[in-house]
Each structure stands twice: as C-alpha cells, then as structure tokens.
C-alpha cells in the first residue's frame, strides 16, 4: 500500500505547557476542527478525548501523553498532524521528556493571565535540550486579567526567546472577539462561541495604528534572520506575504524566532489559525537533521566509534525509537514508536538493537486518543503503536535486522520521593507485585524495590501526586487494595575527601578458594556528576576479564549505601593496582573485594548525607505575602526573589523536600485557598549535621 500522505505534509508536534494553561482543551478543539470528534469534550466536565484515564478525568489534569493523528487542509492541500498531548504537572516530567525526544515541533500554551509559570520554564528548557522548534499560543484571552503584551514580554525576559508576534488580539477579557493577522492585515472576528460563524473583516480603525507598528516590527525581525531578506528590506522593497512566511518558517525551524498567536480555546477562538500556523511554520520530518546512532555495543562519543546516519526516507533501512509503553485495557501492552527512516509492514520481524533481541510486529495501530485503527504499514516520519511487544521498553531502538543501529536513548531524572506500601490482604500480595512491575514498565521514573532489612515494598517517584496516581491506578486497573506509609525523602550519601583504599577478599575452604585484591583511589566529584569509573591497571596485575566485575561490585555497593543505606553519588573511582591468583580468582571474588573497598572508603572519606532541594514558586495575594515568606523560613527555605504579577506577589524559593510534605494543604488553609504553588526538584545539597545525625541514628535503630 503506497504512502497516503507525502512526508513534507506530515507534522509531528507536541502540545506542552504549565498545568492549567489549557493544553488539553486546545488539543480537544484541534481534534474537533480536524473532524476527529463530532462532539467537543470539556476537561471540566471530565469528557475530554485525550484524557482517557479515569484519574485524569477526575483530576482534570493530563497524566499520560496520548498520541493522536488529525488531518488538516490548508489552501486545498491535505496535511497530517500527529499530536502528542503531554502533562504539565511537574511530577510527570518524564512524559514531557519522552514526547519531546520524538517530536519535530511543539506548541507551547501559555495562560494569558499568569503568563510564563515555573513549569513553562522547565518545559521550555526540556524543549531546548532536544532542539525542538516551537510556536506559542497565548490562551485564555477572555479571562479577567489577561494581557497579551505582558505574556509576550515574559516570553522574552523569562525564557530568553525572540517572540515574533504574528497576531494581535481584538478586545480583551469579556470583549475578546477575534484576532488581527499581521501578514494579511485582516481581522478575523468570531461571532459565536462554537467557532462556526467566523468572518474576515477590515481591521477596526482604532486598532490600525497599533497593528501597523506591530507589522513593521515583525517584518524587521524576519528580515534580520535571513541575508537575502535583509538586502531586500534595506533596499526598501516591499516583502510579499509569501516571502515573509517562508522567512519566518526558516527562522522558526532554525530556532531563531518563535511565532506567537493568541486565542481562547474554551470559547473556540483562535484554534483554526493555530492549526494553520502548525502547518506553515513547524517542521516536517524532512526539515529536521538526519538521525545518528552507533553499532550495537558501542557508545556515542567514545573514541573510534563509527557514527551511522539515517536520512528521513522510506528507502532507508527501517529505524525507529520506542518512546512509550502503555498497558491498554483492551489489547494488552502497547509500545508507541516513532519511525525515523524506512518503512515496515505488520507481521515483519525487527531487531531490538538496544537489547539484542528480535521482536515481531504482529499488529500495528494508529492511535486516536483512546480509539485505534489497524494499519498494514508504517512509513518514515510517522508515529504508530505495536501490540504486545515481548522485549521492547521505553528508549529502545527497533530496526532492520540486516542494518543494526542504536539511537541515543531517552535519559530520565532519578526519583526523589519514596513510600512504603503493603497489600491489605494475602490475595492482594501477588496482584500487587504484578501491578507494580507493569506500572514500572510504563514509567521509567517510577521504581519499585524491596527493603532488604525490613522486607517492605518501597515505591519511588517524582513527587507526592505521582505516587498518589500510581496507588490510584493500582486500585482501579488492577483491583489491588494497599496501605500506604508516609512519603519519605530519598537522601543520598557522598564523600568529601579523597581516599586511597586497599581491600582483599580471600577465602580458603577445602577445594577451590576465592581470591580478589584491589587498590582503588576514591575522589569526590562535583554535585550531580554521578559515578565515574577509571581503569588505570597496567601490566595486567588484574586480568582485564575481571575489570567489569570490579566496576559492577562498586556500582552495586553504591546502591545500598554505607552510613544510612542511601545510594552513594558523585564519586570517581580509579582502579590502579591489585593482584590475582591463577586458580582461586573469579569475577565473584573481585566483585566482593570492590564492594568491601567502597564501603571502607566511604566510612573513611568524611561522608555526608545529601538532601533533595525543591524549587518552589508560590503566587499569593499581597495581604498574605508575610505569611508565605514566614512559612518558607520555618521550612528551612531560602528565598530567591519576590516579584509582582498583576495584583499578586510571586515568591520564588529553594526548600528541602523533607519540609515540603503537605505544603499545598497548609498553604491553602493559611491563605483562605487564594494562593497557589508549584514545585520541582532542583538539586541535592548537604544536610545540616544535626539533622544528618538524627537520620543516621534512626536508620541504624531500624
């Protein structure tokens, strides 16, 4: 079956934003206008198509990134827009991170009242990391306190972006009724709230001067990004709308400019123009650089590694990245993947090059939020899902078995909060372990482990809401009732001075003995650098087949910690000497010797505990400012800055996670429910000595 839509007519985009900026509502409207749903779903009614999990419909927030395909016609040409709706709540950053990795462009939705919020900054940084071109949509222009100008200014100041304003709002708050297109200099007026009666008219006379000024600024901005246009502009030539749009498209894809549009998605205003902008300014898969990878077993960036390049074309060998695993209630396990090159038909075998295993693509689906369409073939640049993968997980590469390639995987942040959980009945016991392992397969930032000393099951995640949703899903989807402990902070251990340590593991009991002997130099690394292992053995004093066992022994010992049982981080270990025994040495013996070595070194290295510090932003009415600041101080917080936003005050602070449990509830009661806050993990910091002592004593007593 030939390709239905040419590659240059495909757009893979994500809709990303702060919680409550109106992201899902915007997606709903897009699906409505592209003819994908005949009735609009409302988030506040709990019927939104993209929010198809019960928890999402109850909480009115988006938790999983649903992928959807929508057609759109512009100037008589048919385009296909693949949309990934991502959550804005910080506890679910993993969803944003993994969607951005496979997108070509993004729509960033801002709340016209609040402007750039903390999560908007996080998302913007994530999009920068993956070089994703984007357009901005200033939503909620009909709300009291909305200001388009302020929002544009904040995009400039807070995000360091260059906003290219392509539309101006007509009216604001309850008088918002349309937009001015600065290219055609025509006004689009919405005469009803369904977006059916839309008319193009002349710009209202009183807005004409402002529109002309804004148009000149826009032309100048576009001309500056392209030498040819600059010349024409300086010669005083009038640039055509086509030239300007072409220039803006190029500047957007090169990430020099960010087009800004406005509207009110809930009132169906501005969404059709947003779809036009997606097609006009955001890249097709062909506009993005070719994808690169390595041969299986090699690491990108190492010396002498051969870099393999795949062009975006149906004729190249099949290459795709799995970016999400979902347990679907009807068809079982689904793996969403993005095809970067080549094509594949259902029933074919592919190689999972990350794990070195074959996978059969039994059924291929194209997803529409929660309804699915079976397809026979999937082509370069498309997003699809395979049913029942045996060996594939998030971040894995699947490719043509005859042309293996491994793409760079997706890196996820480490969990910062943990909680004990136990089944209520014996019958729940087995169901719970199945449920937890399935949920951990879906979500790489959710971890499950058993505490060796207490035998408790511990779950770890990115925040209180994250773990709450996991427990909730366990109850609903897997019918497991469980008791939860209080959330606990996931501390870390590290050393503060270099240590030279020698350890020998020798065991002589009749028959074959055990012998491993290592000398390792341990040094502290700067915060956030993780673990670095250096093999400095010369002359084969330890044979090279035992070196990986030494590294593994160190890594395993680091996981279980030394002074209080927390993972050891920010450490460099240089293996420089040791010895072996012809008969008695084994991988096991060297693993144990390395583990003993690490434990002793940490004890001698003036160890300290590190605690996670959260970046908190609280928006409060002026009269509660003192209360909010006092509260931060009582939580060992460090105020970073206070600024006015409209008639509210925004307080930014760094606060230890240990002191933030239940913060939202306390804040609501202290401010009569009028203040809001958002927080995200920022970094680890040394714990004050008295507190560290208390924790170590408590842990050793247990």
From Swiss-Prot:
One of its GO terms (cellular component) is cytoplasm. One of its GO terms (molecular function) is GTP binding. Keywords: Cytoplasm, Elongation factor, GTP-binding, Nucleotide-binding, Protein biosynthesis. Belongs to the TRAFAC class translation factor GTPase superfamily. Classic translation factor GTPase family. EF-G/EF-2 subfamily. This is Elongation factor G. The lineage of its organism: Bacteria, Bacillati, Chloroflexota, Chloroflexia, Chloroflexales. Residues 8-286 form the tr-type G domain. Coiled coil: none annotated. Gene3D superfamilies: 3.30.230.10, 3.30.70.240, Elongation Factor G (Translational Gtpase), domain 3, P-loop containing nucleotide triphosphate hydrolases, Translation factors. GTP binds at residues 17-24, 85-89, 139-142. GO terms for biological process: ribosome disassembly. Its main location: cytoplasm. Catalyzes the GTP-dependent ribosomal translocation step during translation elongation. During this step, the ribosome changes from the pre-translocational (PRE) to the post-translocational (POST) state as the newly formed A-site-bound peptidyl-tRNA and P-site-bound deacylated tRNA move to the P and E sites, respectively. Catalyzes the coordinated movement of the two tRNA molecules, the mRNA and conformational changes in the ribosome. It is found in: Cytoplasm. NCBIfam families: EF-G, PRK12740.1-3, PRK12740.1-5, small_GTP. PANTHER family: RIBOSOME-RELEASING FACTOR 2, MITOCHONDRIAL, TRANSLATION ELONGATION FACTOR G-RELATED. It comes from Chloroflexus aggregans (strain MD-66 / DSM 9485). The keyword Protein biosynthesis applies.
């Amino acid at each position: 079956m030939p390709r239905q839509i040419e590659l240059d007519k495909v757009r893979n985009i994500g809709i990303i934003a702060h919680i409550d900026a109106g992201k899902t509502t915007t997606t709903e409207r897009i699906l409505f206008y592209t003819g994908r749903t005949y009735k609009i779903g409302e988030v506040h009614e709990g019927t939104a198509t993209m929010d198809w999990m019960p928890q999402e419909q109850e909480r009115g927030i988006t938790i999983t990134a649903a992928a959807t395909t929508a057609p759109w016609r512009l100037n008589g040409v048919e385009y296909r827009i693949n949309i990934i709706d991502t959550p804005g709540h910080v506890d679910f950053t993993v969803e944003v991170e993994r969607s951005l990795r496979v997108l070509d462009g993004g729509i960033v939705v801002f709340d016209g009242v609040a402007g750039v919020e903390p999560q908007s900054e996080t998302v913007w940084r994530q999009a920068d990391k993956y070089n994703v071109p984007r357009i901005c949509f200033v939503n909620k222009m009909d709300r009291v306190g909305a200001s388009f100008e302020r929002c544009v200014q904040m995009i400039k100041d807070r995000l360091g972006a260059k906003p290219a304003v392509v539309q101006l709002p007509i009216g604001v708050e309850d008088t918002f009724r349309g937009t001015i297109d600065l290219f055609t200099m025509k006004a689009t007026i919405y005469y009803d709230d369904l977006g059916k009666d839309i008319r193009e008219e002349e710009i209202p006379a009183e807005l004409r001067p402002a529109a002309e000024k804004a148009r000149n600024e826009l032309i100048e901005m576009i001309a500056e990004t392209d030498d040819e246009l600059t010349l024409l502009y300086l010669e005083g030539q009038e640039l055509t709308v086509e030239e300007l749009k072409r220039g803006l498209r190029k500047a957007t894809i090169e990430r020099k400019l960010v087009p800004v549009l406005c509207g009110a998605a809930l009132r169906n205003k501005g969404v059709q123009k947003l779809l036009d902008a997606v097609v006009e300014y955001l890249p097709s898969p062909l506009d993005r650089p070719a994808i690169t990878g390595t041969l299986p077993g090699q690491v990108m960036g190492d010396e002498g590694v051969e870099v393999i390049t795949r062009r975006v074309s149906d004729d190249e060998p099949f290459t795709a990245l799995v970016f999400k695993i979902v347990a679907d209630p009807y068809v079982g396990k689904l793996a969403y993947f993005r095809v970067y090159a080549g094509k594949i038909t259902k029933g074919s075998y592919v190689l999972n090059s990350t794990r070195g295993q074959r996978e059969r693509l039994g059924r291929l689906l194209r997803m529409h939020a929660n309804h699915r369409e079976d397809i026979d073939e999937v082509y370069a640049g498309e997003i699809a899902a395979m049913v029942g993968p045996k060996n594939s997980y998030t971040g894995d590469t699947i490719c043509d078995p005859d042309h293996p390639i491994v793409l760079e995987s997706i890196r996820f942040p480490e969990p910062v909060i943990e909680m004990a959980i136990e089944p209520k009945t014996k019958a729940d016991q087995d169901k719970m372990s199945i449920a937890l392992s399935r949920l951990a397969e879906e979500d790489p930032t959710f971890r499950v482990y058993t505490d060796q000393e207490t035998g408790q099951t511990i779950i770890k995640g990115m925040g209180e809401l994250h773990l709450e949703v996991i427990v909730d899903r366990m109850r609903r989807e897997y019918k497991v009732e469980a008791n939860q402990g209080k959330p606990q902070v996931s501390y870390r251990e590290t050393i503060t001075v270099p240590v030279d340590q020698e350890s020998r593991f020798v065991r002589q009991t009749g028959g074959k003995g055990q012998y491993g002997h290592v000398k390792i130099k341990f040094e502290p690394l700067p915060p956030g650098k993780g673990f670095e292992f250096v093999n400095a053995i010369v002359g084969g004093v330890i044979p090279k087949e035992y070196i990986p066992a030494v590294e593994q022994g160190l890594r395993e010992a680091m996981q279980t910690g030394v002074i209080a049982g927390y993972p050891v981080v920010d450490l460099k270990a240089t293996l420089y000497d040791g010895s072996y025994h012809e008969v008695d040495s084994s991988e096991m013996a060297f693993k144990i010797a390395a583990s003993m070595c690490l434990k002793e070194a940490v004890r001698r290295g003036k160890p300290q505990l590190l605690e996670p510090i959260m970046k908190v932003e609280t928006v409060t009415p002026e009269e509660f400012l003192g209360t909010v600041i006092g509260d931060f101080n009582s939580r060992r917080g460090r105020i970073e800055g206070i600024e006015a936003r409209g008639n509210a005050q925004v307080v930014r602070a760094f606060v230890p996670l240990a002191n933030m449990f239940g913060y939202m509830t306390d804040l609501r009661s202290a401010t009569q429910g009028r203040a809001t806050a958002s927080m995200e993990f920022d970094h680890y910091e040394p714990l004050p000595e008295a507190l560290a002592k208390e924790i170590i004593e408590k842990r050793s007593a247990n």
